[in-house]
């Protein structure tokens, strides 16, 4: 289990990164043969990304909510993410083609992704008494005191740093 860092921290977001949400929703649980290949493809892709940092993948975390499986990923750039997704010598493109062949029009499983480019002044975060998590786990975390006690100040250093409650 990851170690908890006591106190308040924020992501050390000094450069742009890409936040990529990718996942699937199982629409028909009993149609195992339809959605299982899509489900099994993700661990292969994550293994490949972990073995080769040059592909641009920084960090990822998985979440389960009912029928939805979500992977939140952090990438060095959109260009590297796109190159991986379309690369003929990587795991993703064959999995994408197999998904389309098996279930694209069946409705048994849905897939989704959202892509965001974030950087200094466009995102802020707070982690209080937490292990490394999210953006802070991807880019590193620093004490809030060095970046501002309030979310408004962390988003825009020109805004007065007046926290709504007493910081700890």
Spans of model-derived segments:
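Short S/T/G/P-rich N-terminal loop/turn motif that feeds into the first structured element of a domain
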Residues: 1-68, 80-83, 106-168
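An amphipathic, aromatic/His-enriched active-site/gating alpha helix that lines ligand/cofactor pockets
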Residues: 78-110
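Tryptophan-centric aromatic hotspots in well-structured domains and transmembrane helices
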Residues: 74-76
